[in-house]
């Protein structure tokens, strides 16, 4: 803070004061505690010569050279402030359009700063009215400033007109009102539809099947039913054996009359056969479903016969239910719901968490309408709590870890290793993330890397968004290299029948590792090409960037405070005043600062010395505790994949590690740690799991798999393997960029296995599984919600004030996905078609 004249130049003898203390000064604290108002000034110079009138009741004005705390203290007895009126100012120039913060007050060459205080209200004003007036003026000021900042130079003159600004403000409020009312009407409609249809549940029948007798039952059809769903539970396997006819199986026959029958011709009997193979391990149970089309309203007959090698009976559970709506109708509804969710996220109409919740509600309402409404217990079972536990535990670990200053230390070390070369640092970070994600879960990798990257970019005055997007893309690529790097790979390797074909851990990892290395060699130059015309450095100096970020954080803090009490209202008003004061300072710095930043830091040696003094380890003892616990957690992650005797999954390991560190760190204020947890990200994943399972019940994923199999069968035999690899890679990539790759992979494995077992097709299973792995893992880079690591990275970045939108990720992620899938497809074609590595 300094004194300036009318021409904007500093006075040579004026003292320069730098305000670094962010806490409330002592004088202001005493004034708040005493609940006093500044009295009328009796002595001193007349303030009207240097400060304007008409600001009483909302702000007071202090000379810039006077000490802030002493100014408030002296104001009690002999203040030189303007006279406080007992009512609102009647000055005609003080209206709703009057700015709360004046940029410069030139009167006799001096400058004043505004001092906001929640006690500067008159006796006739209520606290709530004053607070509402403050926030109304604050929002109006923000709206006008936002319009001014976003306007181009050509439109600046038009936007300066109050009439244009008023019309734009009314239009914005109208669009906002239409959005809220439209979404509210949609939610009410879905809620009504969901409540009209009851949860019928499934009535399971216990059957004892033997090769000596069959089981049969007659079902009466419903009037409005078009589908019949039959569920079987027991020792079943989803896919058929490699050599059909030699395994134990059961055959479900569904017989009904043809709808084309008339009174002159007897209706023909139509029989649907469903063959289900039994698991040799009778203790492993699973549930399988099959949907049949109901042709008429006549009685439907179900017959079940078993083909067993022994005469011992096999227990089996069976349930059935009628559904409304054909498969094509359900797929159309599911596609519309998925498109609506993506529209809400792409155009940022609502937050992505709320968009996923709206999509889940719409999908549940659609299931209720067709007659398959799930119970609350069933919906909760759809949520993958292992993933949520992993996220929650690692967020707790990272929150405590950040208190040690380790992330700042790592940022300085990375800056030293790169020797000031930005692209060398970015490639190094992406390569380390790719290698680490090959052995760790992608979510864990981004939870550890995102805070370090953000701090490093702040030190180097880089835009963290661009670096984080590149980092998470290479994390997803590196996760596809091993059998434990990505969930689709784990699902493929865990299949017992695929293990018999040679797709074990070592074979799968060796095959995928070669292909991913080729993908990395192509994607690193592509990343440089895509960022060729993008400015990774911030356009403003680091001081301006930090000030903007500070304003953003203060504004978010003020918005999160709910004014439920008088004290909270006072704090909220103080925070809003802080935001306005910082915006005034930002406007001055933007007006005076002009600096051109080169693409390479020439003075990196000088900067590294300053950074090492500024960014050090703040708590060495806590750092040792964090490194011990985190190292043990990562070691258990590795051990869990290779040692079957450890009965802990990733979620349990992360939760236990978080509890250990909470005890060792001796955390007393637990709420501070909970504030660091990304609850919006956890809710987004929970809603996304429900949405994907509901879409699977609407036959969307099954329909995609069946259509892919039909396209492969249509290709001539000599070109069928080429077509199968190409189709599976691209269908998996596009589907995984839109929906969760875990249920898609679990659905596609039986489809591809049945396709390979079909003697008319004659395709080997390993190339299809490798194509599925490449597409499902690399396809997650296509969109922001295509992979779990993308959502986690975006959530942490948003918590730090550097959130990126769907389109910002899409501009880089989708081209990288297309190129990486193309390289992976070419590798599979050479390996399995040319070389014959099957």
From Swiss-Prot:
One of its GO terms (cellular component) is lysosomal membrane. The chain crosses the membrane at residues 180-197, 331-347, 354-370, 385-401, 424-440, 514-530, 621-637, 648-664, 680-696, 721-737, 761-777, 818-834. Expressed in melanocytes and retinal pigment epithelium. It comes from the Eukaryota. Residues 78-87 have a biased composition (Polar residues). Coiled coil: none annotated. InterPro entries: Cit_transptr-like_dom, Diverse_Ion_Transporter. GO terms for biological process: cell population proliferation; lysosomal lumen pH elevation; melanin biosynthetic process; melanin biosynthetic process from tyrosine; melanocyte differentiation; spermatid development. Belongs to the CitM (TC 2.A.11) transporter family. It comes from Homo sapiens (Human). This is P protein. Residues 38-60, 74-94 are annotated as: Disordered. Contributes to a melanosome-specific anion (chloride) current that modulates melanosomal pH for optimal tyrosinase activity required for melanogenesis and the melanosome maturation. One of the components of the mammalian pigmentary system. May serve as a key control point at which ethnic skin color variation is determined. Major determinant of brown and/or blue eye color. Seems to regulate the post-translational processing of tyrosinase, which catalyzes the limiting reaction in melanin synthesis. Changing residue 385 to I: In OCA2; severe. It catalyses: chloride(in) = chloride(out).
